[in-house]
Amino acid sequence: MKNKLCLLLILSSFVLNIHAQKSIRIGIIGLDTSHSVAFTDLINGDKDNAFAKGFRIVAAYPYGSKTIESSAKRIPGYIKKVEQQGVEIVSSISELLDKVDCV
């Protein structure tokens, strides 16, 4: 019973923290496909988009797959595109997790 109560308190705290924020901060792992740019445009691009209201992509770790040459070549271009939408590029997944609420 004590464990359940502790879990309930922790989850309640998490939910209240998210509701207190202006928006839920989203992170992306991997800027090696066009999907990452498309999702960033959808969520960050149109302020009046009801689908994305309350959400914002704020950070991205660019490397999904460094070993697939065709994917790795696209990363620099996709970095520029998401930076134009206000996304911060981070150097590690650990750093990304410190900046976001969900990935």
Descriptions of predicted regions:
Residues M1-K22:
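Bacterial Sec-dependent N-terminal signal peptides
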